[in-house]
Amino acid sequence: MKRGGLLLIVILLALGPAIALAANSAVNAIESHKHLGVASCSNSVCHGASQAFRDSSIQQNEFAIWQEFDPHAKAWQTLGSDASKAIARKLGIGDPAAAKVCLDCHADSIADGMRGERFQLSDGVGCESCHGGSESWLNAHADKGVTHKDNLKNGMYPTDQPIARARLCLTCHMGTADRMITHRIMGAGHPRLSFELDTFTWLHPHYKIDESWTRRKGEWNGVRDWAVGQGVAAENLLELVTDEKAGWQGIFPELVLFDCHACHQLMSGRTWGPRQGTGLGPGVVRLNDANILMFRHVLAPVDKAAASRLLEQTRALHQATTKSREATFAAARKLHASIEGLLPMVAAFNYGPESLDAILSSIEADAARGEYRDYAAAEQVAMAAQSVVVAFENDGKVDADKATLLRSRLDALYATIKNEDSWSREKFRSALAALRAAAP
């Protein structure tokens, strides 16, 4: 099934290495070896072919796909736009194309001493930004007898492992302690950020999941990627909330960690309503708990009791934010410990056809309770629904007519989140209910 909707307009092989990245930053892993530059990968017999090779374990036109279709290739060029320059002026950081806070995510911002002769900053977010410095594996990684495991030992980043991939993607698509994307940046005009691992994995892919990929790297499961991504994103939020340096600015917590739409609403609006998952009254700034909320749905087919505990702990965290920093830290650490303990089980779980109905039912139940009161949660629901619908079709659970109907309902759901400024809770809930009714 083609992965559709708004965002197209815009597996676990070894738990050990992926989980270890929680302590050893993904950024450190990427920057631990010299970066030789995109040009070192673009030879026509390597990754620079104009067309995909038929009888190859990889497509070999990865460079061409990246250069022509992938926004990562134009990330550095974006810094020369009038909008980027305006943001930089407001922040007082000078030329955005030279400012570290911008280069961290709009380029491969490896230190000067770790750059090879063919490295160019203007290449944007290139191969080694995600696959890691290639100094120790470039020459050997395609040799006969060299395995993917060998490449990982030599410094290649394990992007095939969903936990590791999520930790890396989040460094720029949401921000982490070592690449903090702050509310000041947003206030200066930077677009709001959101992320969902499975959806973003399939935006302009330069790879395909086939027999060769599966043989080398293991079975792929999109719903599991979605599930893992929600857990890792939730962990990241809670780590930042309890980070005295990255998560706080003076007497204030870092506001980028909070729900944008809890404050950014029309002054004439009267849209507040209660949420069981927070227990907060009107006029209270709320943490952006969209990923935590989604992780409860992840658990629906895995451990319902754990999902219930997570609801209680999430509510306790929201309540703690109205009391003190100490209470907030304690509640956040407790919730983080729960998610951290559940993540390996989620990553190892086989999200087969029988689990999809449980996930959709859990999502729909929260809609009926009024949990999706703001755009951020609705956006995550739409991306979750896409992962589940794709899985329905890939698993052969629906026939062609049912697949067409589901795609139509999914497109209608995405249409309701196309514009966050005019988002309608009622239209969103109606579209979600229609999608749920059409599901097997």
Where do the PLM segments sit?
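A cross-kingdom marker for long, charged
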Residues: 365-372, 376-440
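Cys/His/Pro-rich metal-binding microdomains
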Residues: 39-47, 103, 128, 170, ...
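Short N-terminal segments immediately surrounding and downstream of signal-peptide cleavage
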Residues: 24-44, 48
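Positively charged n-region of N-terminal signal peptides that target proteins for export
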Residues: 1-4
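Residues immediately within or flanking Cys/His clusters that coordinate Zn2+
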Residues: 34-43, 95, 99, 124, ...
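Primarily the internal scaffold of c-type cytochrome electron-transfer domains
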Residues: 23-29, 50-89, 117-125, 133-375, ...
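Bacterial N-terminal signal peptides
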Residues: 8-18
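Post-signal peptide N-terminal segment of secreted/secretory-pathway proteins
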Residues: 89-128
